[in-house]
Amino acid sequence: NDMATLKFNAMTKYEFAEMIRDIEREHDMMYCIELKNSNNVIGAVFINPDRLRYRVNALSLSYYLDCRYYRNGYMYEALQAIIIKLFEQEIDIISARVFKENTASARLLEKLGFQYEGCLRMGVTGYQEIVHDDFFYSISLL
């Protein structure tokens, strides 16, 4: 991961590798984002159960994009397609969390129709042991 992406990432490289192994073992969903003309992987979207909601058909998204491809619409296109697919599978609500400082990601979620739910102050220790406030967003068809 590049430095621009790591600053908004709560995992170390080792934790990220372990998460990939867990996904393979537990069959959680992960989508790679590829460039159409070269098939180069430029990012990923991870889908997991929303563990903050109880007895609700809810999933949580997290996503990463190589900084060379920021602000080109790639993540918007990928998330839009995934959200449509999840709602077709009768998911009730989809959540996402972003660090307070990650204004571009917050704007992306809002553009996709997510609503701001609130802030967990000092919610996540991220890269280089920096503690971040964590913004919560969700989208629902209900």
Model-assigned labels for residue ranges:
Residues 30, 34-142:
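Acyl-donor (CoA/ACP) binding surface of acyl/acetyltransferases
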Residues 20-32:
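A short helix-loop-beta-strand connector motif used in the catalytic cores of GNAT acetyltransferases and
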Residues 1-21:
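Conserved GNAT-fold acetyl-CoA-binding loop/helix
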